[in-house]
Amino acid sequence: MNIKKVLTAGAAVAIAMTLATACGSNSTSSSGSDTSGGSSSSNGSGTIALLLPDTTSSARYETQDKPDFTAEVNKLDPSAKVDYENAQGDASTQQQQAEAAITNGAKVLVVDPVDSTAAATIVTEADKAGVKVISYDRMISKAPVDYYVSFDNEEVGKLQGQYIADHTPKGGTVVMIDGAQTDNNALAFAKGAHDVLDPLFKNGTLKLGYETYTPNWDPQNGLREMEQALTKLNNHVDAVLSANDGLAGSVIQALSAQHLAGKVPVTGQDATDDGLHDIMLGTQSMTVYKAVPKEAQVAAQLAVDILKGQKPSSDLVNGTQDNGSGTPIPAVLLQPVVVTKDNIQDTVIKDGFTTMAKINNPK
């Protein structure tokens, strides 16, 4: 992964100030589609298709990405229209949704791929039709996408790996429950974690007892994997590197059945209310906070710039990413932050990302 630069915290704040915080959403079924915005594309500046991957790996897509993206587009260009679809974890469905969006006249596709490799076909079809593609959150592999908006995903894994390194006793056994192998981000998270932990595994400071990828990031798959790890290791587990909060919840469930919850460090990612609740309870140790509203707002800014035929500002596009296409992809890369019980107030609460009421009573 080739990242030339990463957005600093200060620049992220500047972007956040430039892009007003999203303030509204349009209701929709989680399995359906939604059309939001001002005039239709025939009367306005054009249509942006927002294609998100699922509703199971994280609650963020319905509760944050979709409403925040839509609100920002509406603010920046009230005449633009946002067509929203969720693939519910099916790559073929996402392909069909993309083709329909192109047929219906979308000028920009903002795609968070179900399958990073399969989604290359979406880029090919869009390119033939003169439609621009922004790869959102997850990178589409080996395809000439126009822009990429995400976080420094290897850094996410490094933060998780460093937490495990700092909080696991010498000689301790580590379990790694990674994300979906079809997700380029999951590969980056795992690589970042291994960059930190492999030297410790090699010199015997720590032991890697079990590692697996989790199909579709599905928490039920994660539960089975953690149960298998505990069985294989006879419950001799000293730390669990879990790729996100959804999987962390499954890890905690498996640990609880063996009376180990709260005794074993468990990592997470996404700063979900459930994950933060578990952190407050002491059963999850940390999460990696990614300011999703900022990510959605940045993607909206890029999409609107494309609709208007404007080149995005160099203050916005701050790096490049190698996705195997042979061409560096212009990228906006935001910085992730570790959240523990000690700094919840200074991070997710201070930013308005969530509230203690939601954390104490997650849905």
Regions found by a protein language model. Name each.
Residues N2-G10, A22-K363:
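A residue-level marker of the well-folded mature domains of exported/periplasmic proteins
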